């Protein structure tokens, strides 16, 4: 009933405003009472027309379909425009029926109505805020004091929502902004207190509990710098996601999330050439191996955005394929998807799949990737990473697949691990396949991805949750990192750029010290490193390097048209000799013998297996 009465009440109020404004305009325009009386009689005869015209125009301008508690400049423009149009319409009708009043009366009426109607809406907004404050007055005696970093549009919208819905939980003390012209000024009734350099002092002076970073369009490097400043305080850190993460482009408190390690990387979102990517994926049947894995599942999601005809999700583990299928059914219910449980080493099965579905694009993400684990079973690494790639690549060529993209790793460069060496051989095989096939074969090489299964971040989080210690193999160990979506998007972009035979190298930015990463994660979890949570150095594991390389120094890279993608200059190999060596190594089962054969195939492979003897 309330939802029917409220609009009716607003219409009645507007009617009163229209009549009052018309009468006021008469007495403002004419000082002579006799003249005023004459036009007053004419006005009274026109009041039904004036009221009807104004209400219809207000309805057309949706003045009765707005939530006035959020009223701003857009609503003010609508009120002004509606009253101008209403005045012109009323004047036109008056001329038509030959009862026109002086033109100044229409102008005065419109001007007064802007004040009356605008004032009534402002009253609704103030009243709504007052009621909301009254509701929360006694809910919480202790409110979290908040600093908002970013006195821009996002910060203003966030403050309005905090004042509207979270007034009993958070109290915004002020804004932080690097624009010094804003300092000392007020935005949405809240003062801009200083720049990022003042955060630590202000947090201490005002006893701030939480710092919210509300700068969704700012580059990742700047966000990283601000986070590092905020980490010096004891405040809880939350952040609005980047613009590319906000689906509707609106700002909401519900979108606030804790600052995570990904934010500390300071990496900017990838700029895809969507036209080029869509050109080779749109309307195509796309097969993805390892589709249930961290990278494979994200490639599935990114490909789905490009409107393929059909997605073939190939994986050995039924649970992971089931999970990605469930996600895709929710996100893309109309897209054709086929879950396929298969081992990439099973040539007969893979051939049957490609023969039946006839994929045009293949992303080969299936692989054994855990470095220490593969040191203990090198023969299994060879069969999965080398034989699996050989089977998929040869079958793709046989069925004339248009584009074949293999996911590789920085560990393939001057490898010290079995896993890295097997991936280097897989790269070599894919390159050779390109020379004797109509299929465009390419490999894409990148470093560690944050949050992938078995990676260091999930391990650290588990260790922190258990109270520590957090284990780091070496205090000086460094790794390249990027986020899973970033890696997957660049893989798609590399596929669009492929001419055939390239080994693409992704720009991983600067390497990150794992020890620093552990400290940051402990701090972000609300603990003090080596006080609340111990960091324990355990020593290098089998096959590990202190530093990873994305390309060998003697070979170098070439630039491409994309700033984050390069082409590695890699020496050619003899296909027949490589085929023979692969056949030979597949016959070997004893670990040390497999390693010796790997060294023969990849002379730059320097095994680091001392830890196996301990």
Predicted regions and their residues:
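Conserved Rossmann-fold cofactor-binding substructure of NAD(P)-dependent oxidoreductases
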Residues: 341-361
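Flexible, Lys/Arg-rich cytosolic regulatory linkers and terminal tails that connect or flank
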Residues: 223-285, 397
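Conserved Rossmann-fold NAD(P)-dependent oxidoreductase catalytic core, especially the SDR/UDP-sugar
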Residues: 233, 248-249, 364, 368-427, ...
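Signature of alpha-helical transmembrane segments in polytopic membrane proteins
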Residues: 1-141, 170, 183, 232, ...
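Strand-loop microenvironment adjacent to phosphate/nucleotide-handling motifs in alpha/beta enzyme folds
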Residues: 271, 276-280, 428, 432-448, ...
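A solvent-exposed beta-alpha-beta segment
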Residues: 9-10, 19, 23, 34, ...
């Amino acid at each position: 009933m309330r939802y029917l009465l409220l609009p009716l009440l607003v219409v009645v109020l507007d009617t009163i405003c229209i009549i009052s404004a018309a009468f006021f305009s008469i007495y403002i325009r004419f000082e002579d009472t006799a003249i005023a009386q004459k036009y007053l009689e004419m006005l009274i005869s026109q009041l039904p027309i004036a009221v009807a015209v104004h209400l219809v125009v207000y309805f057309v301008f949706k003045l009765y379909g707005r939530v006035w508690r959020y009223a701003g400049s857009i609503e003010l423009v609508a009120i002004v425009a509606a009253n101008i149009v209403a005045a012109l319409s009323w004047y036109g009708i008056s001329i038509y029926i030959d009862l026109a009043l002086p033109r100044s009366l229409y102008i005065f009426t419109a001007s007064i109505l802007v004040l009356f109607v605008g004032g009534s809406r402002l009253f609704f907004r103030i009243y709504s805020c007052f009621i909301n404050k009254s509701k929360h007055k006694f809910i919480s005696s202790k409110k979290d004091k908040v600093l908002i970093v970013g006195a821009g549009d996002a910060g203003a919208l966030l403050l309005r929502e905090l004042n509207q819905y979270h007034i009993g939980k958070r109290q915004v003390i002020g804004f932080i902004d690097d624009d010094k012209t804003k300092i000392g000024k007020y935005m949405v009734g809240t003062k801009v207190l200083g720049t990022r350099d003042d955060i630590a002092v202000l947090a201490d002076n005002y006893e701030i509990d939480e710092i919210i970073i509300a700068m969704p369009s700012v580059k990742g490097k700047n966000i990283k710098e601000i986070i590092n400043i905020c980490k010096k305080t004891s405040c809880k850190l939350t952040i609005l996601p980047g613009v590319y993460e906000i689906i509707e482009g609106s700002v909401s408190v519900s979108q606030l999330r804790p600052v995570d390690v990904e934010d500390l990387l300071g990496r900017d979102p990838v700029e895809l050439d969507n036209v080029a990517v869509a050109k080779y994926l749109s309307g195509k049947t796309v097969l993805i191996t390892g589709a249930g894995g961290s990278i494979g599942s994200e490639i599935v999601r990114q490909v789905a955005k490009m409107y393929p005809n059909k997605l073939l999700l190939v994986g050995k583990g039924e649970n992971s394929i089931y999970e990605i299928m469930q996600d895709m059914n929710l996100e893309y219910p109309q897209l054709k998807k086929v879950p396929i449980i298969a081992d990439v080493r099973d040539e007969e099965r893979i051939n049957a799949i490609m023969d039946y579905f006839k994929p045009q694009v293949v992303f080969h993400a299936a692989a054994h990737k855990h470095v220490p684990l593969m040191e203990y079973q090198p023969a299994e690494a060879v069969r999965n990473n080398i034989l699996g790639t050989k089977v998929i690549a040869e079958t793709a060529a046989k069925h004339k697949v248009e584009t074949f993209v293999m996911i590789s790793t920085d560990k393939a460069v001057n490898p010290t691990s079995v896993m890295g060496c097997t991936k280097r051989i897989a790269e070599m095989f894919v390159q050779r396949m390109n020379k004797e096939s109509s299929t465009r074969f390419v490999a894409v090489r990148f470093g560690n991805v944050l949050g992938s299964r078995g990676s260091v971040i999930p391990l650290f989080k588990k260790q922190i949750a258990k109270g520590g210690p957090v284990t780091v193999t070496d205090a000086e160990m460094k790794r390249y990192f990027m986020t899973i979506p970033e890696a997957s998007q660049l893989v798609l972009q590399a596929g669009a750029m492929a001419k055939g035979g390239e080994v693409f190298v992704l720009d991983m930015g600067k390497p990150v010290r794992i020890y620093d990463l552990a400290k940051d994660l402990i701090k972000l979890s609300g603990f003090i490193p080596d006080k609340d949570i111990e960091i324990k150095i355990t020593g290098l594991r089998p096959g590990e390097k202190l530093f990873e390389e994305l390309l060998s120094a003697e070979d170098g890279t070439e630039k491409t048209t994309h700033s984050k993608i390069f082409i590695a200059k890699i020496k050619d190999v003899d296909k027949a000799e490589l085929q023979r060596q692969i056949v030979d190594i597949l016959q070997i089962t004893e670990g040390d013998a497999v390693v010796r054969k790997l060294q023969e195939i990849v002379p730059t492979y320097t095994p680091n297996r001392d830890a196996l003897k301990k």
